[in-house]
From Swiss-Prot:
Alphabetized SUPFAM superfamilies for the sequence: AbrB/MazE/MraZ-like
UniProt keyword annotation of Transcription present: yes
PANTHER family tied to this protein: TRANSCRIPTIONAL REGULATOR MRAZ
Chief location: cytoplasm
Ranges for domain SpoVT-AbrB: 7-58, 87-130
UniProt KW keywords: Cytoplasm, DNA-binding, Repeat, Transcription, Transcription regulation
Subcellular localization(s) per the UniProt record: Cytoplasm, Nucleoid
Protein name: Transcriptional regulator MraZ
Species assigned in the record: Chlorobium phaeobacteroides (strain BS1)
Amino acid sequence: MAGFIGKEQHSIDEKGRFMIPARFRKLLGDGKEARAKGAIFYVMKAFDGSLELYEPEIWAEKEKGLMSLSDFNPDERMLKTMMYERLDSVEMDRQGRIALPKDFLLHAAIVKDIVIIGANVKMILWSPEKLTSMIRESGTRFQVLAGRYF
């Protein structure tokens, strides 16, 4: 589905809103319909300090794994609790903006600007400073991983 590819930097307004890149909005439904209806996304706090934005169809596939976990197994129940604690739903307004909850902005250290990376079926949201730092610190690791998987 989706096919989000590319990277853009946008500003965050005083209400915690940012603009979904136009090229990504075009991939949502027929574009106009998604804006008129107010497209819903799921946003998750990632373990690396970024945020991940999923369309409902994509999140539903991921959620199947969570739903298969038992509430009677303490580890599985804890995992479900921790995953859902890191998740929220957000709606895109008619201007193509999404407002992120304050605790999500804090998690990702997003203040004035946001970097939106298209990662095929999801968008990864970073603070520009955190992204630059992560890339700088993992330069040789990237080479090793790319060599291993590509």
